[in-house]
Amino acid sequence: YEIMPSLVGSEMCIRDSTSSMIINKKCKGYAMEKIYKIVAEELKIPVDKVENTIKLLDDGATIPFVARYRKEITGNLDEVQIGDILQKVEYLRNLEERKEEVIRLIEEQGKLTDELRNSIVEAKILQEVEDIYFPYRKKKKTKADIAKERGLEPLAEKFYTANNLEEIQNLAKDFITEEVPTVEDAIEGAMLIIAQNISEKAEYRERIREIYLKSSIIEAKASKKAAELDEKKVYNDYYEYSEKIEKMASHRILAVNRGEKEDILTVHLRLEDSDREKIENMILKEFPKNDLVATYKEIIKDSLDRLIIPSIEREVRNALTERAEIESIAVFKDNLKNLLLQAPLKEKNVLALDPGYRTGCKVAVIDKYGFYRENTVFFLVEAMHNPKQIEDAKKKFLALVKKYEIDIVSIGNGTASRETETFVANIIKENKLNLKYLIVNEAGASVYSASKIAAEEFPDLDVTVRGAISIGRRIQDPLAELVKIDPKSIGVGMYQHDVNQSKLDESLDNVISHVVNNVGANINTASWALLSHISGIKKTVAKNIVEYRKENGNFKNRKEILKVKGVGPKAYEQMAGFLVIPEGENILDNTVIHPESYAIAEALLEKIGFSLEKYNNELNEARERLKSFDYKKFAEENNFGAETVKDVYEALLKDRRDPRDDFEKPLLKSDILNIDNLEVGMELEGTVRNVVKFGAFVDIGLKNDALLHISEISNKYIDDPSKVLAVGQIIKVRIKDVDKDRGRVGLTKKEQN
């Protein structure tokens, strides 16, 4: 065994010298202490709160649970802060593991020095570690490696002491062998060795990378195959395109990447001559000032063009793509969150229409409780169906509206949507019906209709009817319906298929988890798809909960959840507070109060003279008394956590609120809008359907959504549309321009002078 400095500073750790493995666990503790400190400083959060948070998460707690039920331990950190802590700690853990691995790999080659070890230990980011490791990575044998094997390394070293080329030529004679037959071959081999040595220096790579990231220009041109592969000229904007990468927007980065991948564009990075000269002069400083300058420059040019720049360009393009992916995923996350948080239209009987041409419009009735009641088909497109079919469709429509007391008609926005909307608007007008309709984004409805969960819910119904049911339920409870569909099929992303799919999936899953746990779920009505996003519930357990309901009837109290197969004490702890039972035996089971805090709730109620039963029966009187109750004093006297008592107090004082109620209800319509009726300057209300980096797409009632470009959102400069617009938001806009031939409409929100 030997004593070695730990990777975290001055502490000493015991290491088995035969395996390079750290064998005393104390070093890992030191490493974590340093990580906690770094994260605390970066996020401006007390170090003990960072440590407490990570220990909870390491112990199996979920972010929603920690944020809501462990406020005293974390210092009342919210989900975003907890997520940031976790992300940074995971990065630093990976960094420390990579440092250990790199030290081991270099040591196995017998090339590890104290100086090299210290450089690795002091590295702050992964890229720094990789730059240090670069010369030691296993790679294909190069010409320089062959030159070294032929004994030319000493000659390469002479380039730093010789004064001119003649001196080098004389020295090179001593290196002539069977494998190196001439002076020229010897000099060429030595120059290759120097070029490779230059390319492997971490400080050069780091500086050149910085210059490329800050100053390089990306250039795209149409490939030779462009005319053949891009008939619709989708990439026309990039056929002769250049831009500084520092200013390049994420959607343009991803568009260029896709065009290159499809062999439509050729792409490369270019440096200004002044930046190239700056790099060459930086490297030239390592050589002496003498008559070999021209030779040194030749070596530097070879090292840059053949070895450094191709590698750095790949790294920079990857960094550029990663930046674009992060921004694209962030846009998707915001859009998905706002889509899931759309206000539900509760207790409304819905007639759902999934438009179609030849096969007709599929119709489903969904009652106000979300239950499917009946289905039929309307043939209503005048250009395709005969007058009798259209008349029959009108009669069926009116009969269903009367029979089920329909409140809202929900129309999918896909094929034949415009004709279906015209049909509905005309019937409402002709019959003076007190009825509204809305156009629903049906993206993903067909994916749902063919899914396993749809087959489980409606085994006896055709896939087309299931799609109509989804369109209807989406307005009654968007969250409950949309969680059944892969979020990538919902249609609110930007270049979503061009980003890292595992990162995208993880990010979107986190968004769904955040929203679902924020809203909570009724354990007696929620689908397994919704339940699977609740804290502590995996898909198998979610299905077991639904199965338990079928076999035993509704859950009567939260304790009963422990009877479900796969639910142990830890899982129960994580999920219980997020599952509610409105008609349960215990009124607290319909609140956000966690079962572990029921004793606090009962003690608090006792202080105002109420038992749980009395509180349930005399709710208004109990809440009147609670208004004047000093819960802070109560927490101090009983040594209860102040944050927990505050949450318990507020839950007893008010009904459980649905955060979605704070969002605008969808825009209901009774008449149709036609592009021919639009005039520049006309004011309208619209619903934001998608927010992207260059603006937002707004549903103003036409077949296609209109574009509100980022430059038209405000008179003030807007750098990010998502800061002022959200999916589902209802906004007032004016018509800026109309292209009737292409069916395109431009909007503005700018104030008029």
Question: Where in the sequence are the language-model features?
Answer:
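Charged, low-complexity terminal tails
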Residues: A31, D48, T53-L56, A67-K111, ...
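Long, highly charged, low-complexity intrinsically disordered interaction regions
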Residues: I35, N94-K111, V121, E456-N554, ...
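Single conserved hydrophobic/aromatic residue that forms the stacking wall/gate
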Residues: Y1-D16
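Short, ordered loop/turn segments at secondary-structure junctions
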Residues: Y69-K71, E272, P355, K368-Y369, ...
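Single-stranded RNA-binding regions, centering on S1/OB-family and related RNA-binding modules
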Residues: I581-E585, D589-N753
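A glycine-rich phosphate-binding loop feature that marks nucleotide/adenosyl-phosphate handling sites
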Residues: E210-I218, L353-Y357, T415-A416, V440-V447, ...
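Duplex nucleic acid-engaging cores and interfaces of nucleic-acid transaction enzymes
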Residues: Q81-D84, L95-L105, Q109-A352, G356-D460, ...
